[in-house]
Regions:
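N-terminal cap/lid segment of alpha/beta-hydrolase-fold proteins
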Residues: 29-61
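Conserved HGGG/HGGXW glycine-rich cap/lid loop of the alpha/beta-hydrolase fold
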Residues: 48, 52, 57-106, 326
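Glycine-rich "HGGG/HGxG" loop immediately N-terminal to the catalytic nucleophile
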Residues: 80, 101-117, 173
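Conserved acidic catalytic loop of the alpha/beta-hydrolase fold
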Residues: 118-136
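Flexible "cap/lid" loop of the alpha/beta hydrolase fold
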Residues: 149, 153, 162-193
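Conserved alpha/beta-hydrolase catalytic His-Asp/Glu region
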Residues: 193-255
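Conserved serine/cysteine hydrolase catalytic core
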Residues: 227-298
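Catalytic active-site module of serine/aspartate enzymes centered on a nucleophile-bearing elbow/loop
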Residues: 290-334
Length: 334
């Protein structure tokens, strides 16, 4: 029944927005039509009594250095948005595995799924086991930083190094005063995603007020996915994921991380889930990464903090050369 309602809603939205359909490309429910520039592989498995398909990239270097890196993308990102990082790591001898998590991008978006960071971590662990990969360095960006933290806490013996790039979840938004909204309310918000809205948000948050032509590709990807034929299902899974992010903080467990941790922070980032819902006096205190990065580094036993004082939420995309130089040095210094 939900599938029928979502499909009908997607059709009505498409019919009501002919200008949008004519002006911008749209992509399928599993991001069909958008090319990552790398061969996409698929891991099929059963979870929560249903068959699922996890898309992933597995890029092997020409001159291996013996290390494997797992890249965990953020909420508004995909495996493909790691393109520059994949190239930098591969050129330095790292094997790179970059999944699209369930609910995202080129992977299955279930009608019903109990999303937890533990479940997503377990899905990723199953993928690595199938690939015969044991010891890994895990790099997580944004929401992927929360997932990478959970993964490292669940399998500390497997994670030789953890890297977090502007992770969200450095503060507990509920405890800070961000009000809860229901999944249905998140869903209604996600149905309104547009290219203009994505572009403005990314400019202000990801790139610290800057804009370059190469950023437009990722606006097209996200807006095209959210306004394609799978619009309703994409929005529904996005709503479920936002509820997961809001209700499952990892900030209280950073002190339990046993491995070396590299924390890479663009200090002009201002990301905070649901910040616009908070009262003005609270809103202005949220997402202060110039403070959050330093506070978090103090809570992690073996942390190294690298700050980029002129960058926002996505330093690996804002200034790839400078970011990757710092990343590669940090990986070697573990």
């Amino acid at each position: 029944m939900l599938t029928r309602r979502l499909s009908c809603l997607a059709l009505l939205m498409a019919l009501a927005s002919p200008a949008m359909a004519a002006d911008a490309p749209t992509y399928g429910e599993k991001l069909e039509g958008f090319d990552y520039g790398w061969p996409v592989k698929h891991f099929t498995f059963t979870s929560q009594n249903q068959p699922l398909d996890m898309a992933y990239l597995d890029v092997k270097p020409e001159k291996p250095n013996g290390r494997t890196v797992v890249l965990m993308h953020g909420k508004n990102f995909c495996a493909g948005t790691w393109d520059g990082t994949i190239r930098a790591l591969s050129a330095s001898g790292y094997r790179v595995i970059a999944p699209d998590q369930i609910g995202f991008c080129k992977s299955t978006k279930p009608e019903h799924y109990q999303y937890t960071f533990q479940q997503l971590a377990d899905n990723t662990h199953a993928l690595l086991k199938t690939l015969g990969v044991d010891r890994v360095t895990v790099i997580g960006h944004s929401t992927g930083g929360m997932l990478a933290t959970r993964y490292a806490l669940m399998w500390p013996q497997q994670v030789e190094q953890l890297v977090m790039v502007n992770p969200i979840g450095l503060e507990d938004w509920k405890a800070r005063g961000v009000p809860h909204i229901t999944v249905d309310q998140w869903y209604q918000r996600e149905l309104k995603v547009s290219a203009d809205g994505v572009r403005q948000y990314e400019k202000n948050t990801y790139y610290a007020g800057e804009w370059k032509p190469e950023y437009e590709r990722w606006v097209t990807m996200l807006a095209g996915l959210n306004n394609g034929p799978g619009k309703a299902r994409v929005a529904w899974n996005s709503a479920l994921l936002y509820d997961m992010i809001y209700t499952q903080p990892v900030a209280y467990e950073f002190n339990e991380l046993k491995m070396p941790v590299l924390l890479m922070i663009g200090t002009k980032d201002n990301t905070a889930i649901g910040k616009d819902l908070a009262p003005p006096e609270i809103r202005k205190t949220l997402g202060n990464y110039a403070v959050l990065g330093k506070e978090t580094a103090k809570r992690i036993p073996h942390a190294t903090l690298i700050e980029f004082n002129d960058m926002g939420h996505a330093p690996q995309m804002q200034d790839p050369a400078r970011f990757h130089e710092a990343l590669l040095k940090g990986l070697q210094a573990r």
